[in-house]
Amino acid sequence: MLSPKRTKFRRPHRGNLKGKACRGTKIAFGEYGLQALEPCWITSRQIESGRRVLTRYVRRTGKLWIRIFPDKPITMRPAGTRMGSGKGFPEYWVAVVHPGKILYEIQGVSEPVAKQALKTAAYKMPIKTKFVKVESNP
């Protein structure tokens, strides 16, 4: 599972998910991509399960890029704990995703295979997504 080696702060604020993504919205590495249409937190487990699906389709012929990284720790308190006594301990890591962000990119496979692969990976995501192709610049 993905997680940072070290962070500046152990227990950050939750933040909000307003607005659209302004960076990471265009395909930068591959030919085809999976783009988020809704805001959410995507856990490192969800990212990993999507990666496994895509590597099965891509095999050795293609290449895969994961464009999001879970860098935000989510804290939880033990069940049955009374109110107060501070913030909980980090339980898992999430990537903050805004609408328009590219999640995965692939290349080296045909378009129907890429479409099927990214559709299968989209089932693993907790949000609506869409298949995007690289724009050909004239």
Curated annotation (Swiss-Prot):
Record's subcellular location: Plastid, Chloroplast
Residue ranges crossing the lipid bilayer per the database entry: none
Pfam families: Ribosomal_L16
A GO BP entry: mitochondrial translation
GO cellular component, one term: mitochondrial large ribosomal subunit
Alphabetized UniProt keyword annotations: Chloroplast, Plastid, Ribonucleoprotein, Ribosomal protein
GO molecular function: rRNA binding; structural constituent of ribosome
Xref: InterPro entries: Ribosomal_uL16, Ribosomal_uL16_bact-type, Ribosomal_uL16_CS, Ribosomal_uL16_dom, Ribosomal_uL16_sf
Major site of localization recorded for this protein: plastid
PANTHER family in the cross-refs: 50S/60S RIBOSOMAL PROTEIN L16, LARGE RIBOSOMAL SUBUNIT PROTEIN UL16M
Subunit and partners: Part of the 50S ribosomal subunit.
Family to which the UniProt record says this protein belongs: Belongs to the universal ribosomal protein uL16 family.
HAMAP family per record: Ribosomal_uL16
Protein name: Large ribosomal subunit protein uL16c
Gene designation per UniProt: rpl16
